[in-house]
């Protein structure tokens, strides 16, 4: 990776502004974008635990508690009676109704929840609840990525690309001034060839 990065940066830092170098710029730019994408994907897999041994355990659902045992049928009933009600509003209503129940009314659902938890322990003896991390949003640019070699290369390539364009513009103007400085002064006695040559350089 370092040798490839050095090769890319050497091209951008070179003083050669030949057409061959300019043609290589889009290809190098695509390569740097690929490296940034691969870097983010690797980081995302490490954080979310994808393709790991723990991913199977993370997919195991937690056993329902007493409230979920009770609200399982109540939610379905309320949704049928109020088809336009949002799920968040239904959850608020169910939470309020659950608080209004007495301990005696809640007791059967606590017993059912204990049975479900016992069955869950027998089926998954090594289960341990692990809250999932919220997935990070894809950064808009590579500057938000971690400081690994690929992300550092991406930011350096973008910076050197801007410097390359600025240097190309300066070099072009410098060459034009140099050429114009060696042209003979134009006057009424100048030949048509000299006038055409002067007109060509001033239009660049």
From Swiss-Prot:
DNA-binding region positions on the chain: 60-128
Database matches in Pfam families: HMG_box (PF00505)
Sequence ranges of Basic and acidic residues compositional bias: 194-204
Main location: nucleus
Presence of the UniProt keyword Membrane in the record: no
GO cellular component: cytoplasm; nuclear speck; nucleus
Compartment(s) where it occurs, according to its Swiss-Prot or TrEMBL record: Nucleus speckle; Cytoplasm; Nucleus
GO MF terms, alphabetically ordered: calmodulin binding; DNA-binding transcription activator activity, RNA polymerase II-specific; DNA-binding transcription factor binding; RNA polymerase II cis-regulatory region sequence-specific DNA binding
Annotated stretches, region: Disordered: 175-204
Keyword GTP-binding: no
Annotated keywords: Activator, Calmodulin-binding, Cytoplasm, Differentiation, DNA-binding, Nucleus, Sexual differentiation, Transcription, Transcription regulation
UniProt cross-references to InterPro entries, sorted A to Z: HMG_box_dom (IPR009071), HMG_box_dom_sf (IPR036910), SRY (IPR017253), SRY-related_HMG-box_TF-like (IPR050140)
GO BP annotations, alphabetical order: cell differentiation; male sex determination; positive regulation of gene expression; positive regulation of male gonad development; positive regulation of transcription by RNA polymerase II; sex differentiation
SUPFAM superfamilies: HMG-box
Family affiliation: Belongs to the SRY family.
Function: Transcriptional regulator that controls a genetic switch in male development. It is necessary and sufficient for initiating male sex determination by directing the development of supporting cell precursors (pre-Sertoli cells) as Sertoli rather than granulosa cells. Involved in different aspects of gene regulation including promoter activation or repression. Binds to the DNA consensus sequence 5'-[AT]AACAA[AT]-3'. SRY HMG box recognizes DNA by partial intercalation in the minor groove and promotes DNA bending. Also involved in pre-mRNA splicing.
Subunit structure comment from the entry: Interacts with CALM, EP300, HDAC3, KPNB1, ZNF208 isoform KRAB-O, PARP1, SLC9A3R2 and WT1. The interaction with EP300 modulates its DNA-binding activity. The interaction with KPNB1 is sensitive to dissociation by Ran in the GTP-bound form. Interaction with PARP1 impaired its DNA-binding activity.
Protein name per UniProt: Sex-determining region Y protein
Gene: SRY
């Amino acid at each position: 990776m370092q040798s490839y990065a050095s090769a890319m940066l050497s091209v951008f830092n070179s003083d050669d502004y030949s057409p061959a170098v300019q043609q290589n710029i889009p290809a190098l730019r695509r390569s740097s974008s690929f490296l940034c994408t691969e870097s983010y994907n690797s980081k995302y897999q490490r954080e979310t635990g994808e393709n790991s041994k723990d991913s199977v355990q993370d997919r195991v659902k937690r056993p329902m508690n007493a409230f979920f045992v009770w609200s399982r049928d109540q939610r379905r009933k309320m949704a049928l009676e109020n088809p336009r009600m949002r799920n968040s509003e239904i959850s608020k209503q169910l939470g309020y109704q659950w608080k209004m129940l007495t301990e005696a009314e809640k007791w059967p659902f606590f017993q059912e929840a204990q049975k479900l938890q016992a069955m869950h322990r027998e089926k998954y003896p090594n289960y341990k609840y692990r809250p999932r991390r919220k997935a990070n949003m894809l950064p808009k640019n590579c500057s938000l990525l971690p400081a690994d070699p690929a992300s550092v290369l991406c930011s350096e390539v973008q910076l050197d690309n801007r410097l390359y364009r600025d240097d190309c513009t300066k070099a072009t103007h410098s060459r034009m001034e140099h050429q114009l400085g060696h042209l003979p002064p134009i006057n009424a006695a100048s030949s048509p060839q000299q006038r055409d040559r002067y007109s060509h350089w001033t239009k660049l």
